[in-house]
Amino acid sequence: MSIRPIKMQSEATPTMEGAGVHLHRVFGFGDTDPFDPFLMMDDFRNDTPSEYLKGFPWHPHRGIETITYVLKGNVEHGDSLGNRGVLSDGDVQWMTAGSGIIHQEMPTGNAQGQMHGFQLWANLPRDQKMCTPRYQDIKSGDISSLTDDDGTHIRVVAGDYRGYRGAVDGIDTDPSYLDIAIPPNTTKRFPFDTRRQGFAYIFEGSANFGNASTPFGVNVEKEFAGEEMKIRDQSGNRTLVVFGAGDEVEVTSGEMGVRFLLISGAPLREPVAWHGPIVMNSRAELQEAFRELNAGTFVKTGADGWVNTPGS
């Protein structure tokens, strides 16, 4: 057995998307090779409704899949297939855009105004770029989970972990998507298919991964009763850890424990032509997609009554 070393690490950066949603970009719009088959990941965590309520109005996608995982709050969604629904705490939506879909995602938060979730973009292989669009909406109660004797809790969103199968299936890159919470000062190892590329994203607490000499997390200084004291920021510091080759990931949680996503997939190793919400294999395919969008012929499969509007 070999522990996967850390190939690179970084912190998510603040940005704005949609109609003015404040979020943190974990990775994306750069070199896709280290993350193949994944393209982009965002962490949308906000307790200020004015910074997320304008949401992501109607917009197109082609050639990708989007995976939305909600921890807190609600996200209302609709699409050109006629789907309508609401994602709430713990729910997952896996959307395959395929040949083309137009949809909207409108976060509404919870009663306290809190909104927290993640969206991951996965590339589609060349022979599936123009497949029929589809949705998988998974309610929190349908997601497999297990708790080890040491208190480690694992939600299996996609893939297979120790015989627990994720509710999301039928995905070409056969991804593994685990939400893992480890109690304080605990060392764990997780199997990692050698054929896959993958990463961890820490969003609560701190931990050492593999060959790391210092914990990923954040110590902040706050004043209490006139005295400064160091405490562990339980929001985590939005740290991305990308792994090298090996068949296991080793993690030791910090003083306050850790919660992170462990995600992997089989690399496609195909050309990537990417502009905005559309990802194809060549510039010509990309240009054709935008021509169709502007001509009102983008959506190939729509709900009864759906009308393609040029430029939408």
Annotate each PLM feature.
Residues 1-312:
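Jelly-roll (double-stranded beta-helix
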